[in-house]
Structure formats: C-alpha cells, structure tokens
Amino acid sequence: MIKQLVLGVAVLAMIPSGSKSASIAEAGEFHTALTEQVCLANNIYWEARNQTEEGMIGVGLVVRNRVNDNRFPHSYCEVVHQGPTRPSWKNPNNRIPVKHRCQFSWYCDGRSDDIRANELDIYTIASDIAHRIYSGDITDITNGATHYHADYVIPAWAATKIRTVKIDNHIFYRWEF
C-alpha cells in the first residue's frame, strides 16, 4: 500500500507542464520508467536486502544485464517476473506465477511481496540503487553476469556458466553465447 501511494504521488508530481497531449505522453513515459525502477527495486530488496550496498548493486546489475541480453525479456519487470504462469482459480483470465518456478524465488514463493515496515530504510537504499542502475549511472561490477546464486547452494546450471565474481554471499556468473 505504501509503495503504491508513493508511486502515485511521484507520478502526479512529475507530470510536466505544457500542452495537454505532450504532458500525457511524457507522463506515460515517466510512469513506465518509474514502474521499471519499482520492479528492479523490489528484486534488489527481496534478493539482497541482507547484503552490503555492493551486493545489492550486483543483484540489480544482473537484471540490467538480462534486459540487455537477447535471450531474456527486454524490460526490467518482464525479467523480474519471468517464469511459467497458470490460470488463477478465481479468474481463469488472470495468470499467476507457478510456485517456486520463477527466475527470482521471492516472486513466486507464495509469500506476501509487501515491503516490511521495519525495513523501509533498506527499501529506500534498494530504490536509490535501482534508479542509478536504470539511469546507467553504475558501472557493471559483475563483469556481465546474467546469473547468481547464494554461496550455500550449488545449482546445476552453475556448471554451464562462467563465474565472474563473488560479492558478499552471492556468486555471479556470465552466460556465454
């Protein structure tokens, strides 16, 4: 709820002045950019909220690297939400993620995706990092990584990727062509 309220206020506050049609078009572009940054911030928060800022940046850069890789979707939200879906039992026209089958586990773990009230400061950091990554203000410290995992697991796919760097407790990999 807090996230949606902040997003709505930010969109209204940033609508440019000028002609009505230009304002609507610019507001639409701004809303898209803001939505993309919220998707990225959510992923950074849920995947790396217990990491240093460098670790959070690494996780965010993997999403950006995937957006820029033709093997993945071409928007931040599509990358974060990538995975199989199924029809909702309430409304078959509404598709929902298949539990535990998403690219990023938090997105389809069946738990609430609401930001924890006692971690708003961490979400603020994640949002700032997301904005800087989206704006191109952060150099890639992952050496082009498109994948990562926690250092306490060894997924089968790790053997097929090139390890690039370890930041905090995440190991990053690049998927070669």
Residue map of PLM features:
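Sec-dependent N-terminal signal peptides
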Residues: 5-13
